[in-house]
Amino acid sequence: MIVIAIIGIVAAFAYPKVNFTQFRVDAAARTVRVALQNAERLAVTRQYDVVVSFDTVNSRIRILEDNNNNATVDAGEHVIYAPLEDSVHFSVPPTGISGSVGGPINGGTIKTVDGMPTLIFHRDGAASSDADIYITSKRASSDDYRCVRVIQSTGRTLWWRYLNGTWEQASL
């Protein structure tokens, strides 16, 4: 019984030091990465374009199975929305991985579809553009920024954390 009481006291002191926001932002980065990986895989499997649009206003990702490859939502085409974690949104970081940043979604040839920045995955798995997608928490602390990077030629995704003023590649 005494051991349980000691564990409870130690836990009470440790609880305020746990950074739950960091876990939410990490989960949101994984959500973005998984959505992009699934879109790429779907494009290769189904052999048509999959259009991924970033709804920066509503903090969600729209995934369109574009059967006729026209980059617009038509009748009969399947659309899925993937919301970001609670209190996480797309945002411009203090500095980008490769220098200055113009917006939360950056890339060489990012398209705009229905007023949203958009990547298109083609049937060979390649993306329409390289891209850096930046997210953060509502409090926007500098250590809360995350980035998911898409490599255009292969559609491969990587994710990064902004910690202590530098970008560090994260795993899983």
Report residues per predicted region.
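N-terminal helix-rich module
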Residues: 1-4, 9-33, 37-41, 49, ...
